[in-house]
């Protein structure tokens, strides 16, 4: 049966993404001075104000006000007429230390306390910072080994931001959203793009026709592949007819409100934990990254066309309480053998994940817009394919 599947993305100027970027900018500043910082920072942005709160244990000193203002201005909120700008907005901060009850379980995992863990350094003693389920996914339908709808949505959103910042289209403002609907055939392969939706904030003195003409030329045409387009492609631009008031002045933004945009666009389940503002002892972040790393290497090794992995943790324990895989019937060998190889080759303890992916670095602000997965940046170690040969050798 043919099916349609849709995913969305947002620009860096979307209020929720403004909040994510502020939280991760603060995290990076702390990790830069003290790589062992424990950070859980939440941000709220609304008309004329940014509020930062959370739990932090660190030896670093960072200027929260300065980081917040610089981040907002880098995004593009630099003019008071936008209703929100980095120079004039108020910044409130309420940050306190991490609960000692949580810290005792993170500092030394339950297995270490009971003598079951042979750790080579103190990092390997780390217990999970919370309970929860984390998912990783990969599919060979794109070169990034990501679902096509979310990759196209991210690329459209990034291109929209690029033409705004470059001045190519001078009437654009920072807030924006994209959405892509892809048609899949009976073999579950993408065959065409059915609908492209772009909503972008703009100056008041421009018409919908002018906006649509510019976005088709500078955003849609460069991003949507010709082989996936036909005469029935449905293009929607600012369907409400007007999008002048936007950003935090029109829609309050919160850290962690775009978890489906951050991951796989709804192609697989999500455990609910957000990423931004959290240091890597929080398995909400590090285990999601590691699960993507595992899934991508399995698919790249040719063991399956699609691969999902679920990993679940208990707070204070290092080893996961469960690991489950699903190849959706695309496995090239027995799934039990794939699972056995995954468990043999990949160490899912939080400390081991941090070491393997080198996560105690100030790399997180880059993740906070346009997707945590599918972008092969040097800092994104979870996108590396350095376990492919090991998987092939074992199987």
Swiss-Prot record:
GO molecular function: ATP binding; magnesium ion binding; methionine adenosyltransferase activity
Region Flexible loop, annotated ranges: 98-108
Name of encoding gene: metK
Domain of life from the UniProt record: Bacteria
Keyword Zinc-finger in annotation: no
Name of this protein: S-adenosylmethionine synthase
Binding-site residues, Mg(2+): 16
Record's subcellular location: Cytoplasm
């Amino acid at each position: 049966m043919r099916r349609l599947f849709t995913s969305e993305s947002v620009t860096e100027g979307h209020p929720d993404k403004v909040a994510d970027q502020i939280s991760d900018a603060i995290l990076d500043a702390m990790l830069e001075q003290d790589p062992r910082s424990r950070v859980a920072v939440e941000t709220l942005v609304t008309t004329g104000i940014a509020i930062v709160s959370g739990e932090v244990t660190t030896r670093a000193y960072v200027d929260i006000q300065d980081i917040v203002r610089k981040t907002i201005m880098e995004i593009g909120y630099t003019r008071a007429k936008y209703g929100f700008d980095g120079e004039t907005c108020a910044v409130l901060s309420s940050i306190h230390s991490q609960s000692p009850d949580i810290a005792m379980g993170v500092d030394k995992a339950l297995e270490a306390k009971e003598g079951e863990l042979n750790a080579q350094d103190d990092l390997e003693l780390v217990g999970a910072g919370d309970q929860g389920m984390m998912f990783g996914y990969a599919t060979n339908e794109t070169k990034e080994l990501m679902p096509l709808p979310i990759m196209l949505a991210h690329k459209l959103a990034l291109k929209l931001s690029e033409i705004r910042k470059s001045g190519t289209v001078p009437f654009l403002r920072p807030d924006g959203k994209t959405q892509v609907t892809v048609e899949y055939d009976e073999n579950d392969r993408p065959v065409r793009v059915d609908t492209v939706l772009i909503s972008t904030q703009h100056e008041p003195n421009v018409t919908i026709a002018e906006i649509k003409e510019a976005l088709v030329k500078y955003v849609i045409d460069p991003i949507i592949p010709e082989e996936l387009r036909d005469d029935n492609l449905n293009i929607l631009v600012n369907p409400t007819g007007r999008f002048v008031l936007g950003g935090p002045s029109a829609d309050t933004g919160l850290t962690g409100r775009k978890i489906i945009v951050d991951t796989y666009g709804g192609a697989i389940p999500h455990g609910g934990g957000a990423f931004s503002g959290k240091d890597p002892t929080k398995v909400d972040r590090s285990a999601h990254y590691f699960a993507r790393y595992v899934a991508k290497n399995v698919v790249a090794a040719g063991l399956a066309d699609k691969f999902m992995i679920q990993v679940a943790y208990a707070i204070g324990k290092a080893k996961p309480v469960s690991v489950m895989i699903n190849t959706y019937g695309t496995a090239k060998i027995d799934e039990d053998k794939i699972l056995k190889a995954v468990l043999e080759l990949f160490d899912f303890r939080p400390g081991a994940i941090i070491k393997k992916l080198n996560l105690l670095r100030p790399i997180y602000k880059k993740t906070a817009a346009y997707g945590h997965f599918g972008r092969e940046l040097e800092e994104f170690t979870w996108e590396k394919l350095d376990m492919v040969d090991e998987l092939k050798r074992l199987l």
